[in-house]
């Protein structure tokens, strides 16, 4: 029987983390699909809901970019889709014309509130029943 080295244990732990992540993301996608959202869409809505609790509050896209695992261009496209669906509103930052503000619409807040329990239930189920090795 081969003796596990520190490197092989790290590899095994890493693969376990990736496996839990993949299963969790697939399950989140599955439960959100009937609501017209995917896991990345939800993450952006969730960040906006946390960062902009009051109606009319805005968040810089740059601040969202630092918290999601998407390229700047992928995030821009995702926000464009959310805007087209009426879930967010974009505007140019007056202080820095290169910056873009994004805000949840009422429709976006309502959808986020509706699907939040679904996403949290998936996290509770997958992260407590499948710990990384």
What are the residue ranges of the model-derived segments?
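N-terminal helix-turn-helix DNA-binding core of bacterial DNA-binding proteins
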Residues: 26-71
